């Protein structure tokens, strides 16, 4: 019987696809379903999926999600930014315990008054010296 390979071993094999990447965009190589070949890149897609999902949207997992989209019609304020940071931190702790959030920045956009930018830098607990980051932007209410 073949021995199961660790996540780090799979990360070193460029021929192994670990999961689906987000966003799903059509290209000539992958079609609509781009694959990810490292645990770190798959985790970035999983974080994006978590943050863009409202609780109750996922069948069988009613608490999955961060409810960030529910803040879209609220006016930009310091309280809103704090609430978004809390929602992200809580969701990450609940659903991604294998991820360490190294930096979380939620701030209004400098040029668009109703846009909120989110930058989340993360690493995996199995390999904490390797980092990646995702960014999201939301237009909020006026």
Locate each region found by the language model.
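Immediate N-terminus of the mature polypeptide
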Residues: 1-86, 90, 102, 107-142
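Short secondary-structure junctions
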Residues: 93-101
